[in-house]
């Protein structure tokens, strides 16, 4: 196949040399148009190599970040998501902040119907922290889904 397929013109990172940022960089996130907007479906990202810094001690924190969402018009491009998550490597934030920041940045990028983000952080001092946050588009059935998922998440 030659040329750029329809919808891929929106993306700038695929096929180009990867430059890793050393600072928190939400601007690296890219979105493309969902070709199946008439369907409800789940997209899941498992990100097992997430790293951030404790804002107090400067020690590294490690986690698997899980992102589930139901797209609307836009979807996040996976390489840009990888670079975005990598940008937390030298960013100081508590575990709870990390998952909320990630969710809010993805909402700003895509305006999904529904999204949830949770982090399974490696134990520190014998305690693991597993923060969860979610969002459903206001005034829609996805808002009700968010409420139900929050009530049943464990």
UniProtKB/Swiss-Prot annotation:
Keywords: Cytoplasm, NADP, Oxidoreductase, Queuosine biosynthesis. Its main location: cytoplasm. InterPro entries: GTP-CH-I_C/QueF, NADPH_dep_7-cyano-7-deazaG_red, QueF, QueF_type1. Its EC number is 1.7.1.13. Substrate binds at residues 76-78, 95-96. GO terms for cellular component: cytoplasm. GO terms for biological process: queuosine biosynthetic process; tRNA modification. GO terms for molecular function: preQ1 synthase activity. Gene3D superfamilies: 3.30.1130.10. It comes from the Bacteria. It is found in: Cytoplasm. It catalyses: 7-aminomethyl-7-carbaguanine + 2 NADP(+) = 7-cyano-7-deazaguanine + 2 NADPH + 3 H(+). The keyword Oxidoreductase applies. Pathway: tRNA modification; tRNA-queuosine biosynthesis. The active site is at residues 54, 61. HAMAP family: QueF_type1. NCBIfam families: QueF-II. Belongs to the GTP cyclohydrolase I family. QueF type 1 subfamily. Catalyzes the NADPH-dependent reduction of 7-cyano-7-deazaguanine (preQ0) to 7-aminomethyl-7-deazaguanine (preQ1). This is NADPH-dependent 7-cyano-7-deazaguanine reductase. It comes from Porphyromonas gingivalis (strain ATCC BAA-308 / W83). The gene is queF.
